[in-house]
């Protein structure tokens, strides 16, 4: 049975797969992030092989992915937090009032993901990115349309900013719901 089929049947928890794949330091960071999510009433749900989606009010907050670096020497010892919030439904235009901390802005700018031919199907590139995107006052030539923000192996301050970003998204989604737009 393929890994995908096995996981689809079992729908494993992030921590169970993380314990199999990650070294001690990266595992500790994943577990800290999962504890943060739990404390904020956010639960990762299995999405696809080694990937979980975190939703709030039925809107995606982020995805957690393990083992997603096939061209890397780190394969099998990788985790990341992925978000598409800077390209979907023009949400990026509305974040200015939510993100005022310069450190958080710098974190976001440092983790914007350029298009790289992801989502290939049968040799056809489905994701060509979004051209000329301005995020929090900084313009990018192009941003990945699948995962506009990618935080690879976060730890320390990077992990703290990732948590802060998740709270911003949750607050934004809650405000949309109150306004009847979610």
Question: Where is each model-derived feature located?
Answer:
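Short secondary-structure junctions
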Residues: 33, 38-48, 109
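Short, conserved beta-strand/beta-arch hydrophobic-aromatic motifs that form part
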Residues: 47-180
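Terminal, regulation- and interaction-focused segments at domain boundaries
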Residues: 1-36, 40
């Amino acid at each position: 049975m393929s890994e995908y089929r096995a996981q689809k049947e079992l729908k494993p928890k992030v921590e169970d797969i993380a314990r199999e794949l990650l070294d001690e330091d990266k595992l500790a960071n994943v577990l800290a992030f999962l504890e943060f999510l739990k404390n904020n009433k956010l639960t990762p749900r299995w999405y696809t092989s080694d990937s979980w989606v975190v939703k709030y009010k039925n809107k995606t907050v982020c995805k957690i992915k393990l083992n997603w670096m096939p061209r890397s020497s780190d394969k099998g010892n990788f985790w990341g937090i992925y978000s598409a919030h800077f390209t979907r439904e023009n949400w990026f235009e509305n974040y200015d009032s939510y993100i005022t901390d310069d450190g958080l802005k710098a974190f976001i700018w440092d983790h914007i993901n350029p298009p790289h031919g992801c989502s290939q199907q049968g040799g056809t590139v489905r994701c060509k990115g979004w051209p000329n995107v301005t995020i929090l006052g900084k313009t990018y030539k192009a941003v990945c349309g699948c995962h506009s923000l990618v935080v690879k192996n976060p730890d320390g301050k990077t992990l703290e900013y990732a948590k802060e970003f998740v709270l911003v998204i949750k607050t934004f989604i809650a405000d949309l719901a109150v306004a009847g737009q979610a």
